[in-house]
């Protein structure tokens, strides 16, 4: 038997993205966004409302970064989602974040979050709240790379959002090799 929840944005896992952009004053701002994902091999889409300071900064600068929220930074990542940059102009610093300018786009990288997509603005629709960015570069700190130079999710420790229970969770163990395990059924 199934339980119906009606039309709700319930999806597992939901990534926790931290979007960051420079303000016109050169001060970085960021926000937590859980409704987003890869749109195609060079684009990412995120749902953010027009009223956010970060949205205004992205529209002004035409660039942004999307960092993966991590278990190590869950408090700071939640803080930037529940605090408005319009009311707390230094919320980036209050979260304990430090910024380094991206080499690829005019946007800040968050030093404390070790993986980010560096994006140029493609479009924004204030009616649907859909922000689309072209992925110019993905950067990852050496601390989360394995011996082959690939991102190790166990070292990154990304968190996901559970919309049903309003909690953050970490990802679990490796289950099988993708595009391989299904061959057992051929």
Mark where each language-model region is.
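Basic, polyanion-binding surface patches
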Residues: 1-186
């Amino acid at each position: 038997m199934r339980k119906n929840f009606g039309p709700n944005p319930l999806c597992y896992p939901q990534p926790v993205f931290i979007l960051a952009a420079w303000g016109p004053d050169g001060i970085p701002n960021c926000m937590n966004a859980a409704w987003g994902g890869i749109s195609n091999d060079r684009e990412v889409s995120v749902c953010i409302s027009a009223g956010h300071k970060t949205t205004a900064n992205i529209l002004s600068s035409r660039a942004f970064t999307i960092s993966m929220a991590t278990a190590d930074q869950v408090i700071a990542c939640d803080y930037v989602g529940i605090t408005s940059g319009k009311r707390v102009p230094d919320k980036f610093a209050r979260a304990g974040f430090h910024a380094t300018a991206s080499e690829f786009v005019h946007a800040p990288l968050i030093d404390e979050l070790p993986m980010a997509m560096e994006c140029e603005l493609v479009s924004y629709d204030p009616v649907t709240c859909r922000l689309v960015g072209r992925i110019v570069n993905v950067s990852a700190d050496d601390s989360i790379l394995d011996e082959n130079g690939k991102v190790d999710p166990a070292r990154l420790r990304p968190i996901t959002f559970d919309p049903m229970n309003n909690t953050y969770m970490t990802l679990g163990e490796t289950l099988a090799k993708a595009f391989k395990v299904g061959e057992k059924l051929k």
